[in-house]
Amino acid sequence: MGYRIEMATRNPFDIDHKSKYLREAALEANLSHPETTPTMLTCPIDSGFLKDPVITPEGFVYNKSSILKWLETKKEDPQSRKPLTAKDLQPFPELLIIVNRFVETQTNYEKLKNRLVQNARVAARQKEYTEIPDIFLCPISKTLIKTPVITAQGKVYDQEALSNFLIATGNKDETGKKLSIDDVVVFDELYQQIKVYNFYRKREMQKNQIQPSVSSGFGFFSLNFLTSWLWGTEEKKEKTSSDMTY
């Protein structure tokens, strides 16, 4: 009898209900790349980060302002479609610790990424193209990156080189830390700068190849012409001298 009373009066927002969501949200945040958005940290209604999270008796989480606006016209949960009222919502401020931490990680990542792009712009338009700039070199293959990918920590690799390396090492990077190909995303901004670098480098190489050949050809032509002219002049002189002697 006591067991039934306990179940009947059990608070739907008990600690186990919230703690489960917190554990799963923290795990997803830790495994998510800063360029992605963890679903458990966003509101299913407005798709934005949770700023004023509330939790329903079934364990669904929303931004308070968004769910209240929803309930003005619909008296049901957007996901389960079961009856729901404003009184059923429970504040969930504990989740903000995870949300704010991930947002901070995203901000720091974007700053690092922007610095990389700025450095790449400078490197792509350098005056000399004798050596490949370090920012365009893959730390694994030591060659020019073809398809750049970036980790959550801002480390850049060539996609194919990294994929082959991780297969060989059992998903460990060159320092021995765990890393899988799913932990990286394509770095399109850097790819665009590599294209610019390749364009200028190719143009510079063609320029250096054409100029010596044109110069050498002109020099060879001039030398032959001068030699022929001098030789012809000498022959003419000898003939004239011979005629006069005769």
UniProtKB/Swiss-Prot annotation:
Induction: Induced upon infection. GO terms for molecular function: protein-folding chaperone binding; ubiquitin protein ligase activity; ubiquitin-protein transferase activity. Residues 36-109, 131-204 form the U-box domain. Pfam families: U-box (PF04564). Keywords: Repeat, Secreted, Transferase, Ubl conjugation, Ubl conjugation pathway, Virulence. GO terms for biological process: cellular response to misfolded protein; positive regulation of proteolysis; proteasome-mediated ubiquitin-dependent protein catabolic process; protein polyubiquitination; protein quality control for misfolded or incompletely synthesized proteins; protein ubiquitination. It catalyses: S-ubiquitinyl-[E2 ubiquitin-conjugating enzyme]-L-cysteine + [acceptor protein]-L-lysine = [E2 ubiquitin-conjugating enzyme]-L-cysteine + N(6)-ubiquitinyl-[acceptor protein]-L-lysine. The keyword DNA-binding does not apply. Its EC number is 2.3.2.27. Changing residue 140 to A: No change in ubiquitin ligase activity. Ubiquitinated in the presence of host E1 ubiquitin-activating enzyme, E2 ubiquitin-conjugating enzyme (UBE2D1 or UBE2D3) and ubiquitin. Disulfide bonds: none annotated. One of its GO terms (cellular component) is cytoplasm. It is found in: Secreted; Host cell. Interacts with host CLK1. U-box 1 is critical to the ubiquitin ligase activity, and U-box 2 mediates interaction with host CLK1. Effector proteins function to alter host cell physiology and promote bacterial survival in host tissues. This protein is an E3 ubiquitin ligase that interferes with host's ubiquitination pathway. Acts in conjunction with host E2 ubiquitin-conjugating enzymes UBE2D1 (UBCH5A) or UBE2D3 (UBCH5C), and mediates polyubiquitination of host kinase CLK1. This is E3 ubiquitin-protein ligase LubX. It comes from Legionella pneumophila subsp. pneumophila (strain Philadelphia 1 / ATCC 33152 / DSM 7513).
